Amino acid sequence: MVSATRSLLCAALPVLATSRQATGAPVANELRCQCLQTVAGIHFKNIQSLKVMPPGPHCTQTEVIATLKNGREACLDPEAPMVQKIVQKMLKGVPK
Protein backbone atom coordinates (compact mmCIF):
# COMPACT_ATOMS: atom_id res chain seq x y z
CA MET A 1 0.00 0.00 0.00
CA VAL A 2 2.83 2.40 0.87
CA SER A 3 4.62 1.73 -2.42
CA ALA A 4 1.38 2.33 -4.37
CA THR A 5 0.91 5.69 -2.64
CA ARG A 6 4.54 6.57 -3.27
CA SER A 7 4.19 5.67 -6.97
CA LEU A 8 1.06 7.79 -7.28
CA LEU A 9 2.78 10.78 -5.67
CA CYS A 10 5.83 10.39 -7.91
CA ALA A 11 3.58 10.30 -10.98
CA ALA A 12 1.57 13.35 -9.88
CA LEU A 13 4.56 15.49 -8.87
CA PRO A 14 5.65 16.53 -12.41
CA VAL A 15 2.09 17.52 -13.29
CA LEU A 16 1.73 19.62 -10.15
CA ALA A 17 5.14 21.22 -10.55
CA THR A 18 4.37 22.45 -14.06
CA SER A 19 0.90 23.79 -13.36
CA ARG A 20 0.43 27.58 -13.21
CA GLN A 21 -0.78 27.56 -9.60
CA ALA A 22 2.14 25.46 -8.41
CA THR A 23 4.65 27.91 -9.87
CA GLY A 24 3.07 30.80 -7.99
CA ALA A 25 2.71 33.00 -11.07
CA PRO A 26 0.20 35.43 -9.51
CA VAL A 27 2.38 35.86 -6.42
CA ALA A 28 5.43 36.70 -8.54
CA ASN A 29 3.59 39.68 -10.01
CA GLU A 30 2.85 41.04 -6.52
CA LEU A 31 6.44 40.74 -5.30
CA ARG A 32 7.94 43.64 -7.18
CA CYS A 33 8.02 47.41 -7.07
CA GLN A 34 4.84 49.04 -8.33
CA CYS A 35 6.60 52.22 -9.40
CA LEU A 36 8.89 51.72 -12.36
CA GLN A 37 9.03 55.44 -13.16
CA THR A 38 8.38 58.41 -10.89
CA VAL A 39 7.58 62.08 -11.33
CA ALA A 40 9.06 64.84 -9.20
CA GLY A 41 5.71 66.34 -8.28
CA ILE A 42 2.06 66.91 -8.99
CA HIS A 43 0.00 69.87 -7.88
CA PHE A 44 -1.45 69.20 -4.43
CA LYS A 45 -4.98 70.16 -5.52
CA ASN A 46 -5.05 67.31 -8.07
CA ILE A 47 -4.41 64.60 -5.44
CA GLN A 48 -7.33 62.71 -3.96
CA SER A 49 -5.33 60.30 -1.78
CA LEU A 50 -1.78 59.21 -1.16
CA LYS A 51 -0.25 55.82 -0.35
CA VAL A 52 3.25 55.58 1.10
CA MET A 53 4.68 52.08 1.07
CA PRO A 54 7.91 51.51 2.99
CA PRO A 55 10.65 49.22 1.66
CA GLY A 56 9.96 45.55 2.20
CA PRO A 57 10.42 42.11 0.66
CA HIS A 58 8.48 43.20 -2.44
CA CYS A 59 10.57 46.31 -3.14
CA THR A 60 13.72 47.84 -1.66
CA GLN A 61 12.53 51.41 -2.25
CA THR A 62 9.97 53.61 -0.54
CA GLU A 63 7.08 54.11 -2.95
CA VAL A 64 4.67 57.06 -2.96
CA ILE A 65 1.57 56.51 -5.08
CA ALA A 66 -0.89 59.36 -5.56
CA THR A 67 -4.46 58.72 -6.66
CA LEU A 68 -5.56 61.75 -8.63
CA LYS A 69 -9.03 63.26 -8.66
CA ASN A 70 -9.51 62.00 -12.22
CA GLY A 71 -8.97 58.41 -10.99
CA ARG A 72 -5.49 57.90 -12.40
CA GLU A 73 -2.53 56.89 -10.27
CA ALA A 74 0.92 58.45 -10.39
CA CYS A 75 4.14 57.34 -8.74
CA LEU A 76 5.94 60.20 -7.06
CA ASP A 77 9.65 60.46 -6.31
CA PRO A 78 9.91 60.13 -2.49
CA GLU A 79 13.24 62.03 -2.51
CA ALA A 80 11.84 65.10 -4.30
CA PRO A 81 11.33 68.09 -1.97
CA MET A 82 7.91 68.86 -3.48
CA VAL A 83 6.74 65.29 -2.85
CA GLN A 84 7.96 65.43 0.75
CA LYS A 85 5.95 68.64 1.24
CA ILE A 86 2.86 66.96 -0.23
CA VAL A 87 3.26 64.01 2.16
CA GLN A 88 3.60 66.40 5.12
CA LYS A 89 0.47 68.32 4.05
CA MET A 90 -1.50 65.09 3.74
CA LEU A 91 -0.32 63.94 7.19
CA LYS A 92 -1.32 67.26 8.76
CA GLY A 93 -4.77 66.97 7.18
CA VAL A 94 -5.43 63.60 8.87
CA PRO A 95 -7.67 64.06 11.95
CA LYS A 96 -6.14 62.80 15.17
From Swiss-Prot:
Location in or out of the cell: Secreted
Gene3D superfamilies: 2.40.50.40
Disulfide linkage: 33-59, 35-75
GO BP annotations, alphabetical order: cellular response to interleukin-17; immune response; inflammatory response; neutrophil chemotaxis; positive regulation of cytosolic calcium ion concentration; positive regulation of hematopoietic stem cell proliferation; positive regulation of neutrophil mediated killing of fungus; positive regulation of potassium ion transport
Tissue expr: At least expressed in the lung and trachea.
UniProt GO molecular function: chemokine activity; growth factor activity
A GO term from the CC aspect: extracellular space
Induction: By lipopolysaccharides (LPS) and inflammation.
Signal peptide positions on this chain: 1-24
Keywords per UniProt: Cytokine, Disulfide bond, Growth factor, Inflammatory response, Secreted, Signal
Superkingdom of this protein's organism: Eukaryota
Major localization listed first in the record, in broad terms: secreted
Cited InterPro entries: Chemokine_b/g/d (IPR039809), Chemokine_CXC (IPR001089), Chemokine_CXC_CS (IPR018048), Chemokine_IL8-like_dom (IPR001811), CXC_Chemokine_domain (IPR033899), Interleukin_8-like_sf (IPR036048)
Record-stated family: Belongs to the intercrine alpha (chemokine CxC) family.
Complex formation: Monomer and homodimer.
Function: Has chemotactic activity for neutrophils. Contributes to neutrophil activation during inflammation.
Protein name as catalogued: Growth-regulated alpha protein
Source organism per UniProt: Rattus norvegicus
Name of the gene this protein is made from: Cxcl1
